[in-house]
Amino acid sequence: MSADIATIQAPIPPLSPADFSSEDLRYPVLKQHLEEFQLWLEHAFKAGISAEALISARSDYIDQLLQQLWYAYRFDKISSLSLIAVGGYGRRELHPLSDIDVLILSEQPLTPPQAQNVGQFITLLWDIRLEVGHSVRTLEECLLEGLSDLTIATNLIESRLICGDSSIFLRLQRHTFSDGFWPSTEFFDAKIVEQHERHQRYHSTSYNLEPDIKSSPGGLRDIHTLLWVARRHFGATSIDEMVDFGFLTAEERNELNECQSFLWRIRFALHLVVNRYDNRLLFDRQFSIAQLLGYHGERNQPVERMMKDFYRMTRRVSELNNMLLQLFDEAILALETNEKSRSLDSEFQLRGQLIDLIDETLFIKEPAAIMRMFYRMAEHEEVQGIYSTTLRHLRYARRNLSQPLCELPEARQIFMDILRHPRAVESAFVPMHRHSVLGAYTPLWGNIVGQMQFDLFHAYTVDEHTIRVLRKLESFANENNRPAHPLCVELYPRLPQPELLHLAALFHDIAKGRTGDHSELGADDALAFSLKHGLNSREADLVAWLVRHHLLMSVTAQRRDIQDPEIIKQFTHQILNETRLRYLICLTVADICATNVNLWNSWKQSLLRELYFSTENQLRQGNTPDFRERIRHNRFQALALLRQDNINEQKLHQLWSRCHADYFLRHTPKQLAWHAHHLVQHDSQESLILISTKPTRGGTEIFIWSVDRPSLFAAVVGELDRRNLSVHHAQIFTNRDGMTMDTFVVLEPNGHPLASDRHEIIRNALLQVVLAPHTKTPKTRKLPTKLRHFNVPTKVTFLPTHNERRTYMELFALDQPGLLARVGNIFAEMGVSLHGAHITTIGERVEDFFVLADKDHKALNKKVREELSERLTATLNPKDKI
């Protein structure tokens, strides 16, 4: 047994391959030995043995196994033939399910019998369930292919002899590390490009909530890149050896080892949980991994704590990776040595495009100088980063601060100067966050670094999301972004103090992860911070108000009936003035865009625009809208449009006389004209389906005219769900003759309006639904696997209203196939009539808003509300989650 395995105090150590008999090398016995070893790895890990020890043990085990089989197949009798470990196996990094990559190296091409024997050897390895990747090459083939392929070259650089002829392996090593085979400068440049392309695939952040432990920025590949570069240039075979060559300091070595150890531990646990090779921390695995690693807490706390540790580690890896590669480029490869530095002021100079300290002790002597450096970066557009040695001094000074930087009066003044600079975000705040200076400035920021939320809605950690909000706000100053965000690009330059908006953005989620309402807690923090930084009470109050109400506009637009003047009146009373409204719309749009790349769409844009202009109009008028005047206006404007088409006004009068007042109140003149144009030419007793050819509120509007019947809404939304369309808005009306006049706004799964080539298919499908004599209960699809790991208890809330004819209901539930149809069926069974709906899907949960009445057109009484709540809760709490 190897020394590594023998010294590990784990349950029942397995038999070492070095002690295998010829009987042990037979297929069934060998397979059993491997299964026992894999089981031992799992038990040993759960017993507390370190991942490092077990990874080393597996590498030793596989080495010894391959050596035994090499001799069993008599490959040692073939001259100039060797078995070489490459890739992760070459680095001795074998996790439970890592691939075992080997190179069979020969002087001359193998003879047919030799090749057949090698094939049988590899087949046996596959049969015993080893994931072996292999290549069989001559020395000349290796070098030729390595010259043209960076991956092969990298494998050769980190190769390791397992058994066989050592002389041919040493010749391979000499050629691989010669100046003619990927010189250091070329290898370095190629690895930088490779890393950049890999980071781009992961959106340049490790903060995606389902990261790849190996390949995401800050993951193990970033450590490997450092090892590869040092291995090629110095011949260093480990992180420890990199210190001996001056590539990194002892402190950096310790930090890198700590990060690698943590990532190895998570990856090891992941392999045990999934039981197949994969490096992605997907949602459905995170809870099991957190438990295996010993994280505790209520509900989602184990996952959130584990992921917070993960993100903080990957931040450290990213910073070390960037700094050390830059140092290697600048100092060791000595690129552009003739370039002279240029003074920026008495403290900082410019080396190329990088800012550099003149006095290396400045940050220690004057911590406020850290803030001065970032202000210089905002001031000087030519500065694109920080010089590597200055980064080292920054890291050292940051870790030796005696107090947060915000306690220094000079630092506070500089912070506000940065905040007021038009290039503050990209040039200062982004690098301040990247190098952990924001956390050093205020512990409030440090608390949210790496803070994730275990859901499908928030795509980034709280700190990453906040930086993206700031970036989006700064983008509103760019006229090129007007097509995407016309209202915000119009308003942002007119804000009297945009720095107040940026400060509110910085604090809007600062209290996430704490017990209590994060908006209220964050508002208190923002107020104290603002006053401490010299803002007057009016300015500080505005910042705190924005933080406290940063969700108000989004919730109102998406989960309230914004065509109800009473809702607009209530919202306006909370806003109070146009200044607040302008700040809030910009913050709201930026917040939505920075939450999830798929969240923003033309539907949400249209809702927010409508709410903004309705509120602006209300603020300017200063009185409650006259419903009757609005109805008269809508009818008059619609009639004007219809007269352009020579409408039959007698038939129009007959149609409109059968409609209730609400119909004219809640439709625009264009909608009224569109409906009437088709209905006056149509048999009033025949069903009609209209689909808008132009986007309405960013979606496609579907209008249904049909004889009303119970569960018609459920049947329609069930069919739309079956056709993979999402309903975002519904208005339900029945005229005096019992004909439905229902409107649905739908979107494709990509958030776009209905594709034109699907119009006729959808129209015919809906016509079949409304013509059917009975409503068929649609087949409910199974709950998607991704959703089964989330617990969203169904919650029904009835909102207060002064309207005696309507009940406003909010429904929070787990998103699930056929949800709207099931809700509609319950309404029908209870005799509850639906008059409107806003449908909002937020990750794994729905937050829907319904306007309801009883059969007598009155608000629901207490008994009906209680029964409705009970039935919805019982029906929508998923029972097939496992």
Curated annotation (Swiss-Prot):
Cystine residue pairs: none
EC number from the UniProt entry: 2.7.7.59, 3.1.4.-
Catalytic activity: [protein-PII]-L-tyrosine + UTP = [protein-PII]-uridylyl-L-tyrosine + diphosphate; [protein-PII]-uridylyl-L-tyrosine + H2O = [protein-PII]-L-tyrosine + UMP + H(+)
Keywords: Hydrolase, Magnesium, Multifunctional enzyme, Nucleotidyltransferase, Repeat, Transferase
Superkingdom, taxonomy of origin: Bacteria
Pfam families in alphabetical order: ACT (PF01842), GlnD_UR_UTase (PF08335), HD (PF01966)
Record remark on domains: Has four distinct domains: an N-terminal nucleotidyltransferase (NT) domain responsible for UTase activity, a central HD domain that encodes UR activity, and two C-terminal ACT domains that seem to have a role in glutamine sensing.
Record's protein name: Bifunctional uridylyltransferase/uridylyl-removing enzyme
Provenance organism: Photorhabdus laumondii subsp. laumondii (strain DSM 15139 / CIP 105565 / TT01)
